[in-house]
């Protein structure tokens, strides 16, 4: 192969799949001319587990524990979209109390996800101290999750028609205490990071995406809102009970890594506002719509037989998906998380297509890093916020 004089000096570097700044098993084949990036090719699939095919061989109830392994840092959202699709398909009403509980859990999960984005992002660009601070607040969120669901991660809490269990006694007060404390933590981050001249030097003007370009690439979430597009599915689709709360879409117009950082920091403050309003206005009533549980009616148990006395021996609830198709979506921390669902009058979905926000947002990476310095790859990739579990599925 005949190489030109300039091409002979190019160097090909493999970043990942075990590089700490790759945020999982992502591999980048980077072509360098000195310190300048000439080309970048992401290699995906190291964490592919066949999540869509697994869904087509399980009932919705059986599949719920699997979905927390997509985006394993924002598991409430993967559970929510998994039950929202069948609920819309079957026109199932969710009790008001269950909807409020869902909103509280989703916004707490958004905060936890943004916190675990912020710490490693700062570590990627050389600031180690905030990495330890974010774990302090994140532990408090996980303590709340553990008290309500029994699990710190992989909660398996959402159900078709509601949630698995009501909130325990005293949980609402503890959550309100956390909200008050966390607002002071955000002020601390602002002082420590936002006005830091070294941090600003690393992120300002790096990885700029224009508004029209962001739409053409199909970007969503903070990636889209940081480019000047005020688009948030909580306002657009009016799902759950977000319309009952007073909050604003957070956006920036610069489109660089700093803008994406500012959007996520502001979103945490808005999430606290939503949680506080939900905690103060949460109604009483049931936490699950039990009428939709279609039990096996063939064996009608006698009042005194073994099946009747031992509730654990009840048949498993199965929900038949109507013969329809549907695209359900919601605003996850990383962007638009959606599923395309086709039912065929059986307990198993005929098709279950996942639309992961991280996978779509990652597609613009090669374009963003071209003509940048090698060290800027970590900044740009960190600002995109990916989790390989949902990218590879």
UniProtKB/Swiss-Prot annotation:
It is found in: Plastid, Chloroplast thylakoid membrane. InterPro entries: NADH_Q_OxRdtase_suD, NADH_UbQ_OxRdtase_49kDa_CS, NDH1_su_D/H, NiFe-Hase_large. The keyword Acetylation does not apply. GO terms for molecular function: NAD binding; oxidoreductase activity, acting on NAD(P)H, quinone or similar compound as acceptor; quinone binding. Keywords: Chloroplast, Membrane, NAD, NADP, Plastid, Plastoquinone, Quinone, Thylakoid, Translocase, Transport. SUPFAM superfamilies: HydB/Nqo4-like. GO terms for cellular component: chloroplast thylakoid membrane. GO terms for biological process: photosynthesis, light reaction. Gene3D superfamilies: Cytochrome-c3 Hydrogenase, chain B. It catalyses: a plastoquinone + NADH + (n+1) H(+)(in) = a plastoquinol + NAD(+) + n H(+)(out); a plastoquinone + NADPH + (n+1) H(+)(in) = a plastoquinol + NADP(+) + n H(+)(out). It comes from the Eukaryota. Its main location: plastid. Its EC number is 7.1.1.-. It is a peripheral membrane protein. NDH is composed of at least 16 different subunits, 5 of which are encoded in the nucleus. NDH shuttles electrons from NAD(P)H:plastoquinone, via FMN and iron-sulfur (Fe-S) centers, to quinones in the photosynthetic chain and possibly in a chloroplast respiratory chain. The immediate electron acceptor for the enzyme in this species is believed to be plastoquinone. Couples the redox reaction to proton translocation, and thus conserves the redox energy in a proton gradient. NCBIfam families: PRK06075.1, PRK07415.1. Belongs to the complex I 49 kDa subunit family. This is NAD(P)H-quinone oxidoreductase subunit H, chloroplastic. It comes from Gossypium hirsutum (Upland cotton). The lineage of its organism: Eukaryota, Viridiplantae, Streptophyta, Embryophyta, Tracheophyta.
